[in-house]
């Protein structure tokens, strides 16, 4: 495949005007901002249906190109590759994931600014084909994380009840609304872990496309479950009280506006149109409702807005 030219450098701060800052806010930040949840229409949500083999064939060259243009990505990958070598480099038997997939998960979960840059870019990377081609410098990381989650889910397809805590951001929505995170979103199987990341907004989520990545995380004690950007959720409850928000989400299926986006210039045989998959409600038990202390539950909201930055 003839690789597309990557010609311009993404200007610092471009995404900040349209997306929320990371929930890992530093001490001393003043107050909380308000962000409205929606279907994240600008998200880059490719599932690479029918073209994964082509992406794999060109992965190394594209990855080197992105490393040259993205210092944080190159450094994060190098650190993750060293960790992979330490954990599994001398195993005689094959792993559940390819080395590149495992390294991608390690790089995402590391304590660095890579995941923040990646999530901010992913929330806006699908606003147009040209924007994706020229400004989205995480094409390989997105592909590898997507493939890793597919591979892990294939071995144990089930739903999980998870939690997500956010500090410094109050998310607004309404009961019955369909929403997406629009990025790879970290959650935890443990409520106490999620609480430590913040309670300005606290999510209780039933995910059927997110998968546990404990084995491939820099911080296995966090019991992380990683949710892909294309999973759709129904808001089953929205509570507010004592300056805090609680949002309950139930998996509704998955939806992508992009497919094989990188290959579109080669004749348009891939990635045409608006792809929707499995928008029926996922089977299983109803989402458990936890008590909201001194809060009211809303059934209405205001307007649509940005998806959620990584908190865990």
Swiss-Prot record:
It is found in: Secreted, Extracellular space. Disulfide bonds join 51-260, 159-208. Gene3D superfamilies: Toxin ADP-ribosyltransferase, Chain A, domain 1. NAD(+) binds at residues 108, 164, 183, 217. Keywords: Disulfide bond, Glycosyltransferase, NAD, NADP, Nucleotidyltransferase, Secreted, Signal, Transferase, Zymogen. The keyword Glycosyltransferase applies. PROSITE patterns: ART, TR_MART. Residues 1-20 form the signal peptide. Belongs to the Arg-specific ADP-ribosyltransferase family. This is NAD(P)(+)--arginine ADP-ribosyltransferase 2. It comes from Gallus gallus.
């Amino acid at each position: 495949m003839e690789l597309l030219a990557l010609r311009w450098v993404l200007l610092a701060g471009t995404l900040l005007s349209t997306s929320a800052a990371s929930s890992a806010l530093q001490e001393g930040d003043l107050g909380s901002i308000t962000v409205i949840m929606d279907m994240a229409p600008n998200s880059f949500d490719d599932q690479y249906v029918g073209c994964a083999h082509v992406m794999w064939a060109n992965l190394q060259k594209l990855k080197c190109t992105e490393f040259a243009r993205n210092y944080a990505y190159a450094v994060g990958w190098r650190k993750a590759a060293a960790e992979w070598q330490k954990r599994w480099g001398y195993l005689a038997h094959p792993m559940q994931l390819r080395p590149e997939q495992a390294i991608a998960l390690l790089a995402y979960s590391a304590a660095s600014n890579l995941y923040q840059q990646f999530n901010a870019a992913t929330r806006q990377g699908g606003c147009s084909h040209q924007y994706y081609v020229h400004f989205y410098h995480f094409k390989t990381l997105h592909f590898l994380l997507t493939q890793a989650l597919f591979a892990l889910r294939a071995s144990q397809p089930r739903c999980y009840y998870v939690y997500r805590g956010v500090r410094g951001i109050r998310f607004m929505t309404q009961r019955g609304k369909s929403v997406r995170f629009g990025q790879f979103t970290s959650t935890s199987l443990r409520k106490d872990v999620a609480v430590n990341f913040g309670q300005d907004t606290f999510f209780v989520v039933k995910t059927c496309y997110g998968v546990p990545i404990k084995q491939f995380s820099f911080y296995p004690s966090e019991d992380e479950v990683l949710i892909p950007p294309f999973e759709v959720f129904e808001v089953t409850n929205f509570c507010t009280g004592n300056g805090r928000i609680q949002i309950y989400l139930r998996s509704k299926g998955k939806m992508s506006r992009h497919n094989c986006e990188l290959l579109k210039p080669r004749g348009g045989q891939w990635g045409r149109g608006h792809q929707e998959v499995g928008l029926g409600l996922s089977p299983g038990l109803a989402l458990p409702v936890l008590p909201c202390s001194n809060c009211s539950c809303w059934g209405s909201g205001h307007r649509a807005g940005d998806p959620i930055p990584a908190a865990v």
